[in-house]
Regions:
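C-terminal motif of bacterial Sec signal peptides marking the signal peptidase cleavage site
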Residues: 14-19
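Bacterial N-terminal signal peptides that target proteins for export
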Residues: 1-9
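Exported/periplasmic ABC-transporter solute-binding proteins
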Residues: 21-23, 27-65, 69, 78, ...
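A short, structural micro-pattern
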Residues: 9, 116-117, 227
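Acidic, polar ligand-binding/catalytic clefts
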Residues: 91-117
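Serine endopeptidase catalytic core focused on the charge-relay Asp
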Residues: 122
Length: 283
């Protein structure tokens, strides 16, 4: 009896040791998303989300999560929207409300969703000869610049920022066209900031591109009530262009609404600049 019990104990120990020695199978890596039927998604963006680095930050994660491949072109919002109007983009990421509403009113869109914000800012020389720092609104700041005949750089490219700038001049009761102090460069935000820095001039910028540009200009006015900058994502409607990648556009819009994407947007810029560059809107 004792011998039989001893044998059973030995066998049990052997089985236990064998089980311990067998490595636990590693967890299988998450399966890659199924390849979309049309994997290429043509995106036309405003320069600010591209020049700030936001799209380079979001793109690889979106592609890994969905299987789509983004082909991104960037220009001022007016030119970016025009790509949707000609069928050369599946999805738009822009910030020019009037131009967006005109586009949707013409029946080119499938859906338009405002999804994030930041602020336009007035930047200029540290010495601030026009006294912009004391202004309470952008319109007041622009009036001070005009009254001082201080140099001002305008993008002049029909972008969202340029459209906003012209609206501010109108609100200020000033027509800057033809004035010696008003220089139209017909270029993007990065170039406008470079020229403004070289000439120690004022300009209107989005905050994200300004921080990324690292010029010697000073941030003189921000977060005024008339400086809010809203970004929208627009899916180009397949009713106008049969080859539009509507499924890919929907996938991007759905992905933007995920907690993962919203957290990425909320954190963008915090580590490098100590502050977020864009803010999610409520779902």
């Amino acid at each position: 009896m004792f011998k039989r019990s001893f044998i059973l104990i030995v066998l049990a120990l052997a089985l236990l040791l064998s089980a311990c020695a067998t490595p636990t199978p590693a967890a299988a890596p998450p399966a890659a998303p199924a390849a979309p039927a049309n994997p290429v998604l043509r995106m036309s963006t405003t320069t600010s989300v591209n020049d700030s680095g936001l799209m380079a930050y979001l793109q690889p994660v979106f592609e890994a999560d969905t299987g789509y491949k983004l082909e991104i072109t960037s220009a001022g919002s007016g030119a970016a929207i025009e790509k949707g109007r000609t069928g050369d983009a599946d999805i738009l990421l822009v910030h020019s409300k009037a131009a967006e509403e005109e586009f949707t009113g013409e029946g080119f869109d499938e859906v338009r969703i405002p999804f994030m914000t930041n602020y336009f800012i007035v930047v200029g020389p540290e010495a601030d000869p026009a006294g912009v720092k004391t202004a309470k609104t952008a319109a007041e700041a622009f009036k001070k610049i005009a009254d001082a005949s201080a140099p001002f750089i305008t993008r002049g490219d029909k972008s969202g920022t340029n459209t906003k700038e012209l609206a501010i001049w109108k609100a200020a009761g000033v027509d800057p066209e033809g004035q010696a102090w008003y220089t139209n460069i017909g270029a993007g935000m990065g170039q406008a900031l470079t020229v403004a820095s070289e000439q120690q001039a004022y300009t209107l910028s989005d905050k994200a591109t300004f921080l990324a540009a690292k010029t010697d200009l000073a941030l003189l006015l921000e977060t005024a009530d008339d400086m809010l900058n809203t970004y929208s994502v627009i899916a180009v409607g397949p009713k106008r262009f049969a080859d539009t990648n509507a499924e890919g556009a929907k996938a991007f819009i759905d992905w933007l609404a995920t907690d993962k994407a919203r957290e990425m947007i909320a954190k963008f810029g915090v580590e490098q600049y100590g502050q977020a560059l864009f803010y999610n809107m409520d779902k």
